A protein has these predicted regions:
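Short, small/polar-rich motifs associated with maturation and membrane association
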Residues: 1-385, 397-399, 403-405, 460, ...
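Outer-membrane beta-barrel channels and translocator barrels
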Residues: 133, 230, 345, 356-357, ...
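Residues on the lipid-exposed face of transmembrane beta-strands in outer-membrane beta-barrel proteins
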Residues: 225, 350-354, 384-390, 488-494, ...
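Conserved alpha/beta core surface patches that mediate binding of polyanionic ligands
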Residues: 344-348, 615-618, 628
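Short glycine/proline-enriched loop/turn "hinge" motifs that connect secondary-structure elements
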Residues: 352-357, 525, 589-592, 623
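Structural motif corresponding to the C-terminal cap of alpha-helices
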Residues: 367, 371, 494-498, 556-558, ...
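Exposed, low-structure sequence patches enriched in small/polar residues
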Residues: 571, 619-625, 629
Length: 629
């Protein structure tokens, strides 16, 4: 009875401690100007990505870590506040007049924050540059309220899955539309150097991205690249060095002793349940059964027995534990063998900007080399950008923006719940199975080239991934992608006079293109693993994407008597997209290390594809506000 009472006490105490780890904070956010609730205000725990947004009544509820002391409350056009954590809050937000004078990049133009009625979030370059990310989409992590970002593969250079407007159908894409310098972007998002970005605006509601039609149904991310600044030539050189590590700790897994003791316990439980033996008799029977069935678990001649005693003598039947005088013949941790030791990340950026004779220019070069958490994985990127804007007359301006990027990635299998996924299989592999081939003394064996030989488990039990070694695929197989990305944007603008009868009237023509040349390859060695039965396999594919957009926009933006503001847009846009691909797969290599199709004997697959489509749009938008309301 005392033991039961003690256990109940511990259980209740544990529940109380778990509950105490977070504190529920509720409250309302109200405008100090009119005492009306603020809808969509962002409330974030300072220094974390834990946050929420207010509902239609300006109310919110948030589970805050008990260690947190401060909440950051923000909203477009309001001053950001830091509030002390309390269980019930009533937050008054003050108008930020300086912020209201800022402009928001919207579809086919800009708007003042004060008069903008849609839902948008602006991320300026100061926040972007504080994050050492390789992919633009990663810069959105935790910075935009209501936007869900998920990092899936963890491969170096990979981005985040961005969901702005929630999930639709199961099979439909949730990806937002990316717009770079006013033109929808079809290139690789990782081809854009985050250091070249001036700001990003996330258009979250349907009205804000309506002019893009169905392409903007999942939300729109407006990317504005850096432009030249007035003044003399300014040169900036930026260098970053760092190391990567796991964001979350590894799962706790069994060691060799714990694994064998668990096997013994399962045999013992079976003897009790199936044969009705007493615990003492079941222990003896279990040890005998383990010894007779050793080949099914430990392979031929108990080659996967990591201890220096045979299985029948390894477990103490009284305690169910591995005998204390047993020592390990070998020990190889699969996750340790797979992961790199402090993978290096290095980045260099050269930026030059200035102006001369009413012409502003910006030129940048960038290089990124990012090693992955898994050995042999890597991402490299070379980028170059030129932005030029010039004013020929007070009624005639033009500009050009070009970007080139070459990316190269060496990857691994990490995106499936299968044995080929290294993170998945390395943590599920029983600790008694070694990564490398071992001699009778438990020492690693080396091949003629001096490299350690991997154990593909040809005598490993079928339930333990026989004839496969996921870690060996990092070294013996190859997975890679090489991309060349070229993008261009150009415009010419007439009008936009500051006075006279045509004040506020402007005609702009924009042209932009995106070109991607992508080469993928997958190589399986001819000796072991996935393609050993066909003496190796090599698959290569080439994809070419080309799109261009040409639009003509007529805008009229004028304010009368400092009270009435009219913003009118009418336009036409033509969009054309083409994709072509060519792929082939061959098998039958005379030896390993051949990475060209000509070296193989048998064609197993060959295909090609070409597709295209066009979109023609007519645009219209009219806005009116009275005294910026």
């Amino acid at each position: 009875m005392k033991k039961l009472t003690y256990l109940l006490f511990c259980l209740i105490l544990g529940i109380g401690m778990a509950t105490a780890q977070t504190t529920k904070v509720t409250g309302t956010v109200i405008s100090a100007d009119d005492n009306e609730p603020i809808i969509g205000a962002s409330i974030v725990v300072k220094g974390t990505m834990v946050g929420t947004v207010t509902d239609f009544d300006g109310a919110f509820s948030l589970d805050v870590p008990s260690s947190a002391k401060t909440l950051v409350v923000s909203y477009v056009g309001m001053k950001t506040q830091e509030i002390e954590v309390k269980s019930n809050l009533r937050i008054l937000m003050q108008t930020d007049n300086q912020s209201l004078d800022e402009v928001v990049v919207v579809a086919y133009g800009t708007a003042k924050k004060e008069s903008f009625t849609g839902s948008a979030e602006i991320i300026k370059n100061e926040k972007i540059e504080k994050r050492t990310v390789a992919n633009v989409s990663k810069a959105l992590d935790g910075l935009v309220a209501g936007v869900q970002t998920t990092s899936g593969s963890g491969q170096p250079g990979s981005g985040s899955s961005v969901v702005i407007r929630g999930f639709g159908s199961i099979k439909a894409s949730q990806n937002p539309l990316y717009v770079v310098d006013g033109i929808p972007y079809d290139g690789n998002i990782n081809a854009i150097n985050p250091n070249d970005i001036e700001s990003m605006t996330v258009l979250k509601d349907a009205s804000a991205g309506a002019l893009y039609g169905s392409r903007g149904a999942n939300g729109v991310v407006m990317i504005t690249t850096k432009k030249g600044k007035d003044g003399a030539l300014l040169v900036n050189l930026k260098a970053n060095w760092g190391i990567a590590s796991r964001a979350i700790p590894r799962y706790e897994t069994m060691d060799e002793r714990g694994y064998l003791e668990t096997i013994f316990q399962s045999y013992k439980n079976d003897q009790i349940a199936s044969n009705g033996l007493s615990p003492e008799a079941a222990s003896v029977a279990a040890l005998t059964a383990m010894g007779s069935g050793a080949k099914a678990i430990f392979g031929t001649n108990q080659m996967y027995n990591p201890f220096n005693f045979p299985i029948a003598e390894l477990i103490d039947p009284v305690t169910g534990k591995v005998r204390s005088d047993a020592t390990l013949r070998y020990h190889e941790d699969w996750m340790d063998e797979a992961t790199a030791n402090n993978p290096l990340r290095q980045e260099y950026v050269l930026n030059m900007s200035g102006s001369q004779n009413k012409t502003k220019y910006m030129f940048s070069l960038g290089y990124l080399n990012e090693d992955g958490l898994l050995k042999t994985t890597n991402f490299q990127r070379y980028t170059g950008r030129i932005n030029v804007d010039t004013e020929y007359k007070n009624w005639l301006t033009a500009g050009l923006s070009t970007n080139f990027a070459h990316t190269k990635s060496n990857t691994s299998q990490t995106s499936t719940s299968a044995s080929s996924n290294i993170f998945y299989s390395a943590q599920l592999m029983a600790p008694i199975f070694p990564v490398h081939q071992l001699d009778e003394n438990g020492q690693i064996m080396y091949g003629a080239d001096g490299a350690p030989m991997f154990d593909y488990g040809s005598t490993r039990p079928a339930g333990a991934n026989a004839n496969f070694n996921s870690i060996a695929t990092l070294f013996d197989d190859k997975y890679g992608t090489n991309d060349d990305n070229v993008s261009g944007r150009t415009y010419i603008s007439l009008g936009d006079l500051k006075d006279g009868p045509l004040q506020g009237l402007k005609l702009t023509a924009n042209f932009g293109f995106d070109y991607v040349n992508r080469n993928n390859f997958t190589y399986y060695n001819p000796y072991f693993g996935n393609a050993a039965s066909v003496k190796g396999m090599l698959a290569k594919s080439n994809y070419r994407y080309f799109s261009y957009t040409f639009n003509q926009l007529l805008t009229y933006d004028r304010k009368f008597n400092d009270k009435h503001h009219i913003d009118f847009l009418a336009g036409h846009e033509y969009y054309d997209y083409e994709v072509s691909s060519l792929s082939a797969t061959k098998s039958g290599f005379p030896f390993g290390g051949i990475y060209e199709l000509a070296g193989a004997t048998t064609i197993t697959d060959a295909s090609s594809l070409k597709d295209s489509y066009t979109i023609e749009s007519y645009l219209f938008r009219a806005n009116y506000d009275y005294m910026d309301k």
